């Protein structure tokens, strides 16, 4: 690591020869495998952009020039070259973020970890440079599947309209996002191979060459192997130049000298220009290259030599969903699945293997996925759209106007709901229950354990006249939490010890074990409580109001924003029913949460059993008249 440790900032790269740059690239790959294997993170994408990142920082002068990263999980090499080489606590509290972070460095312009948005940013920043007469360069790096998102093409449409506004767009073409990239864009890069004229040319050439003695067949095989290079050279150029964009490439994304030459040409061009780079996701790391599913897109802690996980965490929420989907697919031919370029991460790999003709990967295009789901439902099928909770935010209009308005039977399965922790602000699924509360007819299920995931998924797909949502957490699923009774459609998890109990605890989803712990802590203080799991948190069960009326205080506990969440819905429901019982809602405050473990984040925001029990004890004491108010002392001079 002799060269890497000498890099304190991008300008240190200027002193290195091409041979030293190649050595630096190797050192960076070795560093990444070693560091990320200890912490987990996005390994494959970063192994693929080493030379590209080196070239970018040699040609452009960050932070004066703005280098913007779409799907910021590709920014590890960028961090290393801008003075951030302590990866020992990557994605952990107090350590480096797994994405660009303004708090870390002036070299990080946008904290972007949702795909396809960077070209909009770049368009705006280039316009600002024009208005303010600044000669800074704006460089947007997009790829790893992000060009399957509609936002990128909306931005390109605007960018292409200004022929004399400088903007460099680097397309990192690794043919993959989380998995092999799908859709028309990927197919376009293969268009030349399947055109009639091209095939006739190949057939004629093959016939002539195979009749040529000695050298004919070997020469044909050599030329046949060049098809991909010819195809990649011609097809993308036509696509981008038809939009009115200058095109440079394709460039070998692992040839630093070629990359620098192309980027220098783009830098001098006084208008929008595409630099098309061909890279290999997972480059230099055999376990990643052998992983056909996703090239080690994101990994947990692994053995660096083998790439095998160091430990397994047991049954996880995603796997429970995936296995139940296969069973539902076997029972019902109308069940189909949708994923937005995340087949394996959302647990649909086994469903695809069992029913390859009943799964649709729409690319990084959640809006289209939701609208397509409405069409599938209208056509007589029941689509299950599995997506990370944070990414459904992008499709709100389609959920509202395409699915709900048309009473379509579509089930949205929200993985990574609640606090996800180490991926930081952009990946916490903490807004879905607030955003979706206002959607008419939509129903939301929040299962508390594996059994409830299975049961409530089945209940959801049985609804054919309205959208349903099933949300669950990230990671390992805990032991079953058994109900001791029922109230309407709700499960009673704990009965009170007193005839007139003090507190009704409304437990949402995976927080059931914590709510039972809260009840134990309250019981130790002589406070009797009931714990109820609504199961379906929208709409609020009609049986909740009479149950609440038999208690002195209602407490809601959810892993969602308090603003407009389940607590707000329960409060409104009680008001509508004329139940005048004090309610205290516990959840996530309306702030962006920094990266840390789930437990650390929950402790920081006070969403723990001891914190909640302490506050509820104080509330009950106040109702009892045991609260001692303290007079505010006057300020002293």
From Swiss-Prot:
Its cofactor is Mg(2+); thiamine diphosphate. It comes from the Bacteria. GO terms for molecular function: 1-deoxy-D-xylulose-5-phosphate synthase activity; magnesium ion binding; thiamine pyrophosphate binding. It holds the Pfam family Transketolase_C. Coiled coil: none annotated. Mg(2+) binds at residues 144, 174. GO terms for cellular component: cytosol. Its EC number is 2.2.1.7. The keyword Transferase applies. It catalyses: D-glyceraldehyde 3-phosphate + pyruvate + H(+) = 1-deoxy-D-xylulose 5-phosphate + CO2. GO terms for biological process: 1-deoxy-D-xylulose 5-phosphate biosynthetic process; isopentenyl diphosphate biosynthetic process, methylerythritol 4-phosphate pathway; terpenoid biosynthetic process; thiamine biosynthetic process. Thiamine diphosphate binds at residues 73, 113-115, 145-146, 174, 285, 366. Pathway: Metabolic intermediate biosynthesis; 1-deoxy-D-xylulose 5-phosphate biosynthesis; 1-deoxy-D-xylulose 5-phosphate from D-glyceraldehyde 3-phosphate and pyruvate: step 1/1. Binds 1 Mg(2+) ion per subunit. Keywords: Isoprene biosynthesis, Magnesium, Metal-binding, Thiamine biosynthesis, Thiamine pyrophosphate, Transferase. HAMAP family: DXP_synth (MF_00315). Homodimer. Catalyzes the acyloin condensation reaction between C atoms 2 and 3 of pyruvate and glyceraldehyde 3-phosphate to yield 1-deoxy-D-xylulose-5-phosphate (DXP). Belongs to the transketolase family. DXPS subfamily. This is 1-deoxy-D-xylulose-5-phosphate synthase. It comes from Streptomyces griseus subsp. griseus (strain JCM 4626 / CBS 651.72 / NBRC 13350 / KCC S-0626 / ISP 5235). The lineage of its organism: Bacteria, Bacillati, Actinomycetota, Actinomycetes, Kitasatosporales. The gene is dxs.
């Amino acid at each position: 690591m002799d060269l890497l440790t000498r890099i304190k900032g991008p300008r240190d790269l200027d002193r290195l020869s091409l041979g030293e740059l190649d050595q630096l690239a190797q050192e960076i790959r070795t560093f990444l495998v070693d560091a990320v294997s200890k912490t987990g993170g996005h390994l494959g994408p970063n192994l693929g952009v080493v030379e590209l990142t080196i070239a970018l920082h040699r040609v452009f002068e960050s932070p004066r020039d703005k280098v913007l990263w779409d799907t910021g999980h590709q920014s590890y090499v960028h961090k290393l070259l801008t003075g951030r080489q302590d990866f020992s606590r990557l994605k952990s509290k107090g350590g480096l973020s797994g994405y660009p972070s303004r708090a870390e460095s002036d070299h990080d312009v946008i904290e972007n970890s949702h795909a396809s948005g960077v070209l909009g940013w770049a368009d705006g920043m280039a316009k600002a440079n024009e208005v303010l007469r600044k000669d800074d360069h704006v460089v947007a790096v997009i790829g790893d599947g992000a060009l399957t998102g509609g936002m990128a093409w909306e931005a390109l449409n605007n960018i292409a309209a200004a022929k004399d506004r400088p903007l460099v767009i680097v397309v990192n073409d690794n043919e993959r996002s989380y998995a092999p990239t799908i859709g028309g864009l990927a197919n376009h890069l293969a268009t030349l191979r399947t055109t009639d004229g091209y095939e006739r040319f190949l057939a004629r050439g093959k016939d002539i060459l195979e009749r040529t003695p000695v050298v004919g067949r070997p020469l044909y095989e050599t030329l046949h192997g060049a098809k991909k290079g010819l195809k990649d050279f011609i097809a993308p150029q036509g696509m981008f130049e038809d939009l009115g964009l200058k095109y440079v490439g394709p460039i070998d994304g692992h040839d630093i000298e070629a990359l620098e030459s192309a980027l220098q040409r783009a830098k001098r061009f006084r208008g929008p220009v595409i630099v098309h780079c061909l890279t290999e996701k997972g480059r230099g790391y055999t376990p990643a290259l052998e992983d056909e599913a996703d090239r080690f897109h994101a990994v947990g802690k692994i053995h660096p030599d083998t790439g095998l996980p160091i430990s397994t965490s047991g049954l996880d929420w995603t796997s429970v969903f995936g296995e139940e989907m296969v069973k539902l697919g076997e029972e019902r031919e109308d069940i189909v699945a949708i994923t937005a370029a995340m087949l394996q991460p959302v647990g649909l790999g086994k469903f695809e293997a069992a029913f390859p003709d009943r799964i649709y990967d729409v690319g990084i295009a959640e809006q289209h996925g939701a609208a397509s789901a409405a069409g599938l439902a209208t056509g007589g099928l029941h689509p299950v759209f599995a997506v990370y909770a944070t990414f459904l935010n992008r499709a709100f209009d389609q959920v509202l106007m395409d699915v709900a308005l048309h009473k379509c039977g579509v089930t949205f399965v929200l993985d990574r709901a609640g606090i996800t922790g180490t991926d930081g602000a952009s990946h916490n699924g903490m807004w879905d229950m607030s955003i979706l509360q206002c959607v008419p007819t939509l129903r939301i299920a929040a299962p508390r354990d594996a059994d409830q995931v299975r049961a409530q998924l089945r209940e959801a797909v049985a609804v054919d006249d309205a959208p349903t949502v099933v949300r669950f957490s990230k990671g390992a699923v805990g032991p079953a939490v058994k109900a001791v009774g029922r109230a309407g459609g709700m499960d009673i998890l704990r009965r009170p010890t007193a005839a007139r109990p003090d507190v009704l605890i409304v437990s949402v989803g995976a927080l059931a074990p914590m709510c039972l712990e809260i009840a134990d802590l309250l019981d130790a203080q002589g406070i009797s409580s009931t714990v109820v799991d609504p199961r379906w948190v929208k709409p609020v069960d009609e049986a909740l109001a009479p149950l609440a009326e038999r208690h002195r205080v209602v407490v809601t506990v959810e892993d969602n924003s308090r603003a407009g969440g389940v607590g707000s819905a329960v409060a409104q429901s009680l008001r509508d029913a004329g139940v005048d019982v004090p309610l205290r809602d516990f959840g996530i405050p309306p702030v962006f949460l920094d990266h840390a473990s789930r437990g650390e984040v929950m402790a920081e925001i006070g969403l723990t059993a001891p914190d909640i029990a302490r506050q509820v004890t104080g509330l009950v004491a106040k109702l009892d008249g045991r609260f001692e108010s303290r007079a505010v002392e006057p300020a002293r001079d």
